[in-house]
Amino acid sequence: MPQLNTTVWPTIIMSMLLALFLLMQLKTLNTHYHPPASPKLTNIKPHNNPWEHKWTKIYSLHSLPPQF
């Protein structure tokens, strides 16, 4: 049974990796990425909400009847 000649395999593998690297470089070179988003400046007006100044009960148990 003849032996398999593996002396050229490192050359083939290295040339394949080089070709894949070059193809990926060319592919990423031709892609156009969106520019980074800049924050939109808005005029924020302070709201005068009555619940900001006093404590309110934010929980209620719906299974219990209301207690006064």
Swiss-Prot record:
InterPro entries: ATP8_mammal, ATP8_metazoa. Keywords: Acetylation, ATP synthesis, CF(0), Hydrogen ion transport, Ion transport, Membrane, Mitochondrion, Transmembrane, Transmembrane helix, Transport. The chain crosses the membrane at residues 8-24. GO terms for molecular function: proton transmembrane transporter activity. It holds the Pfam family ATP-synt_8. It is found in: Mitochondrion membrane. GO terms for cellular component: mitochondrial membrane; proton-transporting ATP synthase complex. The keyword Transit peptide does not apply. It comes from the Eukaryota. The modification N6-succinyllysine is found at residue 54. Mitochondrial membrane ATP synthase (F(1)F(0) ATP synthase or Complex V) produces ATP from ADP in the presence of a proton gradient across the membrane which is generated by electron transport complexes of the respiratory chain. F-type ATPases consist of two structural domains, F(1) - containing the extramembraneous catalytic core and F(0) - containing the membrane proton channel, linked together by a central stalk and a peripheral stalk. During catalysis, ATP synthesis in the catalytic domain of F(1) is coupled via a rotary mechanism of the central stalk subunits to proton translocation. F-type ATPases have 2 components, CF(1) - the catalytic core - and CF(0) - the membrane proton channel. Component of an ATP synthase complex composed of ATP5PB, ATP5MC1, ATP5F1E, ATP5PD, ATP5ME, ATP5PF, ATP5MF, MT-ATP6, MT-ATP8, ATP5F1A, ATP5F1B, ATP5F1D, ATP5F1C, ATP5PO, ATP5MG, ATP5MK and ATP5MJ. Interacts with PRICKLE3. Its main location: mitochondrion. One of its GO terms (biological process) is proton motive force-driven ATP synthesis. The modification N6-acetyllysine is found at residues 54, 57. This is ATP synthase protein 8. It is a single-pass membrane protein. It comes from Hylobates lar (Lar gibbon). Belongs to the ATPase protein 8 family.
